[in-house]
């Protein structure tokens, strides 16, 4: 049963406790990465047979496989994927940053600018395992495409027949992914980071995964850019006494069913609501297909915190910095400016977090484990880099060269100082 805690009556360590990983996978992942670097495709084939029970003849998904998979998917689901993709594009197109140039009368003879350039190739990791996530395909690929990435590559584990889940491939076609490979786990991350005979090396790796995938991303960071190292799913709901307990419980369970390590937290100013939500959770869990997972998540990591008022509840939310934050209150926009740390915010009583997972438009790849204090959701920005340029005429250089020389000497860098003025000496 979910714990009910009164704010001010328990230690902060209990209020703000987070799940810590108990499995140490660094050495195993390091060995996998080394093997893929040294043996390339051969290692990927072996890992597919070992971990996925799949004996593959090819790592790449062919167009024929794509056509067959898409044809097998319910047309209604294809239509829903296309609607969701439209919403995701609409939101992310607003994130596009433009290059700029500064060339004005204040600094005649000087041109400065910034170029926004997409990475050449992005790699998307899409999990397999206990659930298929076509939503991840859309959320990760569409921003990359909007950014202008030349080639978007997807990796995902096959089933034991050597096939990729058809709904994953359908989403890949809707999103416009260029190439798909049947490989998962740490070995897939290694292949994207270093390249193999089949899998091309990428510049950016994005997408969620298990502890092995997260550790692999951590280890290859620096060789390649990554989006984030994601932890277990989280939801925090701030709800007042007027909230519907059945709705709040359903929203908490929507995250609890993800993973036994997932965290579902309610912060409310109403003990009556706290007790009603606790009862609703107990009533709803047996109705879930993933009841065992949700039960473990709620019992081990779930909590209800009863605060003195909603402003204190907001303070608690900021301290926890959750991945998903729901504001189930009257006039939610009155509280929006007070929210400083959250991956994504869902406003009002009619905005369940599931809208954001699938359909609304904002990205669902979000910072977890409190990293919303300094990190952001996946966006178009993740797939671009910025470079800058400077141009000076001779006349413009003459105006500043001796200031630059003096500055450089203060740092003891005499070659810098000399470089600033040597051109002016040519005419002397």
Predicted segments, located by residue:
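C-terminal core of ALDH-fold dehydrogenases
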Residues: 318-428
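Short internal beta-strands
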Residues: 150-160, 264-270, 277, 348
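A conserved active-site cap/scaffold subdomain adjacent to cofactor or substrate pockets
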Residues: 228-300, 304
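Conserved small-residue-rich beta-alpha loop and adjacent elements
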Residues: 100, 105-170
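Alpha-helix C-terminal capping segments
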Residues: 139-150, 173-175, 193-199, 217-219, ...
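Conserved NAD(P)+-binding/catalytic subdomain of aldehyde/semialdehyde dehydrogenases
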Residues: 176-254, 258-263
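N-terminal Rossmann-like NAD(P)+-binding subdomain of aldehyde/semialdehyde dehydrogenases
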Residues: 1-120
């Amino acid at each position: 049963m979910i714990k009910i805690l009164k704010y001010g009556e328990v230690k902060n360590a209990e209020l703000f406790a987070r799940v810590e990983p108990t499995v140490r996978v660094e050495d195993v992942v390091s060995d996998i990465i080394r093997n893929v670097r040294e043996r390339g495709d051969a290692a990927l084939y072996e890992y597919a047979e070992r971990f996925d029970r799949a004996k593959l003849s090819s790592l790449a998904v062919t167009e024929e496989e794509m056509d067959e998979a898409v044809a097998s998917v319910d047309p209604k689901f294809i239509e829903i994927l296309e609607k969701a993709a439209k919403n995701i594009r609409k939101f992310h197109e607003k994130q596009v940053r433009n290059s700029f140039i500064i060339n004005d009368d204040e600094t005649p003879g000087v041109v400065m600018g910034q170029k926004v350039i997409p990475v050449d190739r992005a790699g998307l990791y899409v999990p397999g395992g206990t659930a298929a996530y076509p939503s991840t395909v859309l959320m990760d690929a569409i921003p990359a495409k909007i950014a202008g990435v030349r080639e978007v590559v997807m990796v995902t584990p096959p089933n034991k027949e050597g096939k990729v889940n058809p709904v994953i491939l359908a989403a890949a076609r809707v999103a416009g992914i260029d190439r798909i490979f049947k490989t998962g786990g740490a070995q897939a991350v290694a292949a994207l980071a270093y390249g193999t005979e089949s899998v091309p090396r990428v510049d950016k790796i994005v997408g969620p995964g298990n502890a092995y995938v997260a550790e692999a991303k951590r280890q290859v960071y620096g060789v390649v850019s990554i989006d984030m190292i994601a932890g277990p799913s989280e939801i925090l709901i701030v709800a007042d006494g007027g909230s519907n307990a059945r709705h709040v419980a359903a929203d908490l369970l929507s995250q609890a069913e993800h993973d036994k390590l997932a965290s579902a937290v309610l912060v409310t100013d109403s003990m009556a609501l706290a007790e009603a939500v606790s009862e609703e959770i107990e009533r709803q869990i047996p109705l879930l297909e993933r009841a065992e997972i949700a039960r473990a998540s709620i019992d081990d990591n779930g909590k209800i915190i009863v605060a003195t008022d909603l402003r204190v509840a907001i303070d608690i939310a900021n301290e926890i910095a959750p991945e998903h934050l729901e504001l189930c209150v009257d006039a939610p926009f009155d509280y929006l400016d007070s929210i400083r740390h959250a991956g994504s915010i869902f406003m009002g009583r009619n905005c369940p977090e599931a809208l954001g997972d699938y359909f609304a438009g904002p990205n669902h790849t979000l910072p977890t484990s409190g990293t919303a204090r300094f990190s952001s959701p996946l966006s178009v920005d993740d797939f671009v880099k910025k470079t800058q340029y400077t141009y000076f005429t001779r006349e413009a250089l003459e105006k500043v060269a001796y200031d630059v020389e003096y500055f450089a000497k203060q740092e003891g860098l005499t070659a810098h100082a000399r470089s600033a003025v040597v051109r002016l000496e040519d005419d002397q």
